[in-house]
């Protein structure tokens, strides 16, 4: 599908596949519980685990993160450009939907300059959920054709290329810098 068709699907609270820095991601509107529920069912992902949000700028995350707990040093860390994609675990707002953060009082966010993510967020006005596009036990998809093989020929997938990162993002705690997932 082209970018316009994918944007329409996202606005209709559908789940789509889109390229990220290393692999294809499954994403939807994080403000829509029905969209997130569809994503969790499709991915067979336990709700307790929470989800990653991805966007081209920090502003897209302000509805989800507790900004008061983040000091200027941590803001700099979030805004910095890194040689590889990094997802940061940050404090979530107290009223954040549990379907996004699972059993945690935090949420994982990643600022991405991938052109697909930039266009999708700018055109929809929201960050995207981001979980790797693959069924349980199968490697994440690196091409739109692989997505169609796993999820069906009619699955809405954006026909663009993934970035040059060799592996999906590493995940780190913003405050402790502890590595949660190796990238």
Curated annotation (Swiss-Prot):
Enzyme class: transferase
Primary location group: cytoplasm
Entry keyword annotation includes Amino-acid biosynthesis: no
GO molecular function (one): tRNA binding
The keyword Transferase is assigned to this record: yes
Cellular-component GO terms for this entry: cytoplasm
Subcellular location(s) of the protein: Cytoplasm
UniProt keywords, alphabetically: ATP-binding, Cytoplasm, Nucleotide-binding, Nucleotidyltransferase, Transferase, tRNA processing
Catalyzed reaction equations: L-threonine + hydrogencarbonate + ATP = L-threonylcarbamoyladenylate + diphosphate + H2O
Pfam families: Sua5_yciO_yrdC (PF01300)
GO biological process terms on file: regulation of translational fidelity; tRNA threonylcarbamoyladenosine modification
PROSITE patterns, A to Z: YRDC
Source taxon at top rank: Bacteria
Enzyme Commission code: 2.7.7.87
Physiological role: Required for the formation of a threonylcarbamoyl group on adenosine at position 37 (t(6)A37) in tRNAs that read codons beginning with adenine. Catalyzes the conversion of L-threonine, HCO(3)(-)/CO(2) and ATP to give threonylcarbamoyl-AMP (TC-AMP) as the acyladenylate intermediate, with the release of diphosphate.
PANTHER family: SUA5, THREONYLCARBAMOYL-AMP SYNTHASE
Name the record gives this protein: Threonylcarbamoyl-AMP synthase
Taxonomic classification: Bacteria, Pseudomonadati, Pseudomonadota, Gammaproteobacteria, Pasteurellales
Gene that this sequence comes from: tsaC
């Amino acid at each position: 599908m082209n970018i316009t068709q994918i944007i329409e699907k996202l606005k209709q609270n559908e789940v789509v596949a889109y390229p990220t820095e290393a692999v294809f991601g499954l994403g939807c509107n994080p403000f829509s519980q029905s969209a997130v529920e569809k994503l969790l069912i499709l991915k067979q992902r336990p709700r307790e685990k929470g989800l990653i949000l991805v966007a081209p700028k920090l502003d897209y995350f302000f509805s989800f993160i507790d900004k008061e707990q983040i000091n200027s040093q941590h803001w700099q860390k979030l805004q910095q450009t890194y040689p590889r994609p990094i997802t940061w675990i940050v404090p979530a707002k107290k009223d954040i939907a549990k379907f996004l953060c699972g059993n945690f009082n935090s949420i994982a966010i990643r600022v991405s300059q991938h052109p697909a993510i930039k266009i999708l967020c700018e055109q929809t006005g929201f960050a995207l959920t981001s979980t790797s596009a693959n069924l349980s036990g199968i490697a994440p998809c690196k091409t739109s054709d692989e997505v169609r093989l796993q999820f069906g020929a009619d699955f809405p997938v954006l026909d663009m290329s993934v970035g040059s990162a060799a592996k999906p993002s590493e995940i780190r705690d913003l405050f402790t810098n502890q590595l949660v997932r190796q990238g």
